[in-house]
Amino acid sequence: MSDKGIEIVNLLAPKVEMLGFDLLGAEYVLVPSGAILRLYIDIPFAMQPECMVSIDDCERVSREVSAYLDLEEPISGNYTLEVSSPGLDRRLFTLEQFARHHNHLVKVGLKLQQHGSRRLQGKIVRVEQVGGFVVLLVNGVELAVDFNNIDKARIVPDWSALGLAPLEKSKHDTKKMSQGNKKPSNESAARQAVRGVIR
């Protein structure tokens, strides 16, 4: 997370917890019209997977947080608040979240190059809390990644195991699309997995 994202999480986490949710992390993105503040909330880990975040939950958190931000004013200027459930391809923001998703496949973007690259994809082998490292298995090799050097990290779901793999288009369908002069969509059924996003 950016410094601004960390500041906002520290401010809002207690408020979100009072509403019965965990604030996983925040994204603060500057855009021409001002800024976008994205908050990712989830059900407390002990209550998963029996309970899931609903759109109504996102709406309620959005209302409460918006009113709170109006009072505290941690952001100057115009901004748009978005509250979302993490989804299957969730972002990972903390070492604790990496540890919780042990043995999951992740994509990691780095601030500075490590192991010859700024982009890595591998399974989470372990988390070294003391040193602040995430150990990934990349192409059969264990690589220790400095957590402070991680810009973004996201779970890579096994769509096939979830029964959400994209269906192959038949030649007839492909030809029909071409004749209609329409660009084929890359969106798979997996992209339609439930994710509540409230603005």
Curated annotation (Swiss-Prot):
Biological process annotations from GO: ribosomal small subunit assembly; translation
| Localization (cell) | Cytoplasm
Positions of the UniProt region annotated as Disordered: 170-199
Can you supply one Gene Ontology CC term for this chain's record? cytosol
> Which Pfam families does UniProt cross-reference here?
DUF150_C, RimP_N
Q: Which domain of life is it from?
A: Bacteria
What spans are recorded as compositionally biased (Polar residues)? 177-189
InterPro entries attached to this UniProt entry: Ribosome_maturation_RimP, RimP_C, RimP_C_sf, RimP_N, RimP_N_sf
Primary localization class, coarse: cytoplasm
SUPFAM superfamilies per the UniProt record, alphabetical: YhbC-like, C-terminal domain, YhbC-like, N-terminal domain
**What are the entry keywords?**
Cytoplasm, Ribosome biogenesis
NCBIfam families in the record, alphabetically?
PRK00092.2-3 (NF000931)
Q: What does this protein do?
A: Required for maturation of 30S ribosomal subunits.
What does the similarity note say?
Belongs to the RimP family.
Per its record, how is this protein called by name? Answer: Ribosome maturation factor RimP
Task: Please name the source species.
Answer: Xylella fastidiosa (strain M12)
